[in-house]
Amino acid sequence: MRIFLSTLGVLFLMSFLFIMPAVLGPSTTPQPSTSPVLSAAPTPSPAAAQEIRAVWVSFLEWQHTDFSSESAFRADAAAIMQNIASLGANTVFAHVRPFGDALYPSRYFPFSHLCTGTQGQDPGFDPLAVLVETAHAQGLTLEAWINPYRLQANGTPAELCAQSPALLHPNWVKHTATGLYLDPASIKVQQYLADSIRELCTNYAIDGIHFDDYFYPTTAPDFDADSYAASGSTISLADWRRQNVNDLMRACYAAAHAFNVRFGVSPQGTLSGCRDGQYSDAALWLAKPGYCDYLIPQLYWGLNYRKNGSDALSLGRLAAEWLSLPRTESVQLAFGLGAYRIGDGDEGDTSGPGSEWCTGHALATQATTLRSLGASGAALYRYAFLFANTLYPTLAEQEIAALREVWG
């Protein structure tokens, strides 16, 4: 965690920084800086390693959060943070930039449609400032969860405003059948994203920057055939795509570390899915410094998972595979657990009423197992399936109680 000095001068400075975003204004349209993308990554890690006990709060939670006023949002945010702290968790991954839009005033991205229903519309207060304050009040660290490339997916948001990068910089955008994405190959995009991280770290007392598993949205060659051809690269398309993501990782790591802020990623649960599905070279990021401070692969299957008799995707098998990889000392390796599986199961051979997901202690047992294997901790996806579970409220309450025994 970042170390905060309890002097009046620092408190005054932090208060000033919370106010700064309001003067930036989302109407300003900066160009990416001319600083090199691949700047040297400082070491060591900005935070002393401790067990990661985290909860994701996604844009889906924000859809049920009251943004009508600062006081209403503050009440909801405080309740969320209090609940998370009650688990014995120490970290919140708060979704603050889900679709090329932001839960804070930014020079680079418009206000999110989640704040008012209309992308680009100012809610009249700064949601991220409230999230940081309410998290820290509960002794939690707050990491800003960002989707770097995604601008629109499956019709969300329904309309993009004039300040969306999709409209401001159409030559930076790639299309799929279901969405719009920033071009991972574009040096300008990489610089723009790194600059936006500098903005976050300058204006807020965040403890980390967090990416999830949304990198390349497709394996289709025509997604970026023009960019690949223009690059003149002699390496394969797949290796070229991985190189583009690696370049972004190094740039964002360096940007965060310049402010002593952690930078981490939650990639897909299988190494093949990472490497060949989304072109994220997670094994490299684990093995070499300068890419991230932690990885949290998403292992959303149970310990007893079997599919057609195979346990290849069981949590224990996958965790052991990840833990056997070469790992540099500065990178933690924790794992994401699927709280959304409570009651429903993981679609395995034994999924259903008799499965581990109906015991009331699936997540606690998984977290304990990961701890015994030497993992750096666990993160739970996602908040609502524990604290707003209308389908399986009793099971969710039992899972919460069991987690408190493990994390408390």
Summary of predicted features, one role per range:
Residues 23-47:
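Ser/Thr-rich, Proline-interspersed low-complexity disordered segments
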Residues 48-75, 132, 143-199, 203, ...:
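Active-site-adjacent "subsite" loops/lids of carbohydrate-active enzymes
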Residues 69-87, 114-138, 192, 243-250:
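Aromatic- and glycine-enriched glycan-recognition loops and surfaces
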Residues 73, 83, 138, 166-288, ...:
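Polysaccharide-binding and catalytic clefts of secreted carbohydrate-active enzymes
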Residues 75-102, 203-208, 290-294, 372-377:
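Catalytic domains of carbohydrate-active enzymes, especially glycoside hydrolases
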Residues 87-123:
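Aromatic-lined carbohydrate-binding/catalytic grooves of carbohydrate-active enzymes
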Residues 104-117, 150-177, 213-233, 350-355:
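Aromatic- and acidic-residue-enriched segments that line the glycan-binding/catalytic groove
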Residues 289-315, 321-408:
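Substrate-binding cleft of secreted/luminal carbohydrate-active enzymes
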